[in-house]
Regions:
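Conserved ABC ATPase "signature" region
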Residues: 64-69, 110-126, 176-177
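ABC ATPase NBD coupling module
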Residues: 66-84
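Conserved ABC ATPase signature
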Residues: 129-133, 137-139
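Hydrophobic anchor residue at the start of the ABC signature
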Residues: 143
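A short, proline-enriched helix->beta-strand linker immediately N-terminal to the Walker B motif
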Residues: 148-152
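Catalytic Walker B motif of ABC-type/P-loop ATPase nucleotide-binding domains
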Residues: 154-158
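Conserved H-loop
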Residues: 183-190
Length: 206
C-alpha cells in the first residue's frame, strides 16, 4: 500500500499555485496522472522520488515512512526504491547506450540489459553515444534504463512522447509487463495512456 498526503506551493513566472495530492494506492497498480499543464505533475513526481521536499505532508510505502514533514523524517532519494524517468531523459553523455542502461542495473545482468536493448530496438545502437541519437532514440534509452532498475515504484513522465507510433504500442506492452512480473506500482504522466487499453487504469487528477 502506498499512502501520501502532500501540500506544496509552486512558484512560477505568472505567480504561485498550491499542489495538493492525497491518495491511498494498492501495490502493483497502474496510475495515470492527469491535470492541466503546469499544475505540478512533474513536481509531484520529484516529491515522491525525494528530489524535492514538500512544504507539508507524508509518504508511506508498506507502512515504511519515506517522508513526514511534521516529524522531520526524510528518507534520501538514493535510499528509496523508486526509479524515475524525466522528460529531459538525463542520459550520461560520456556513456554509450548500453553503458547508460547497464549503469542503472545494479546486478549488471547482461541478459536483462540485452532484453531491453532488443525490445526497444536499441541493439544496433548499443555502442553509440547519446549526442548521436535522435530525441526518440534517447527516450527509448531513458525508458529502458528506468525499467531495468526493477524498482518498487516507477515514475514515468511522458515516456512515449517522442517515440514513433510503430514502436509505441510494443513499448507500452513492456511497461505493462512490469506490473504482473514484479509487482511494481507505476505512475505515468502520458498523453498516450489510451495505448494501454489492455490494463485497468486508475486515474489520479492533480
Amino acid at each position: 500500500m502506498i499512502e501520501f498526503n502532500i501540500k506544496h506551493q509552486i512558484f512560477t513566472s505568472s505567480g504561485s499555485k498550491f499542489l495538493e495530492v492525497s491518495e491511498m494506492i494498492e501495490k502493483g497498480s497502474f496510475i495515470h496522472i492527469s491535470g492541466d499543464s503546469g499544475i505540478g505533475k512533474t513536481t509531484f513526481f520529484k516529491i515522491l522520488a525525494g528530489i524535492i521536499t514538500p512544504d507539508f505532508g507524508f509518504i508511506k510505502v508498506n507502512n515504511s515512512i519515506l517522508l513526514d514533514t511534521e516529524n522531520r523524517i526524510f528518507l534520501p532519494a538514493q535510499k528509496r526504491n523508486i526509479s524515475i524517468m524525466f522528460q529531459n531523459y538525463a542520459l550520461f553523455p560520456n556513456m554509450t547506450v548500453k553503458q547508460n542502461i547497464a549503469f542503472a542495473q545494479k546486478d549488471k545482468n547482461p541478459e536483462i540489459i540485452d532484453y531491453y536493448l532488443e525490445k526497444f530496438n536499441l541493439k544496433i545502437l548499443e555502442n553509440v553515444f547519446p549526442s548521436k541519437l535522435s530525441g526518440g532514440q534517447q527516450q527509448r534509452v531513458a525508458l529502458a534504463r528506468t525499467l531495468v532498475q526493477n524498482a518498487e515504484i516507477i515514475l514515468l513522465d511522458e515516456p512515449l512522447s517522442a517515440v514513433d507510433a510503430s514502436l509505441r504500442q510494443s513499448m507500452m506492452e513492456e511497461i505493462l509487463k512490469i506490473n504482473p512480473n514484479q509487482g511494481s506500482t507505476i505512475f505515468m504522466i502520458s498523453h498516450h495512456a489510451r495505448d494501454s487499453h489492455n490494463v485497468s487504469l486508475n486515474n489520479l487528477i492533480i
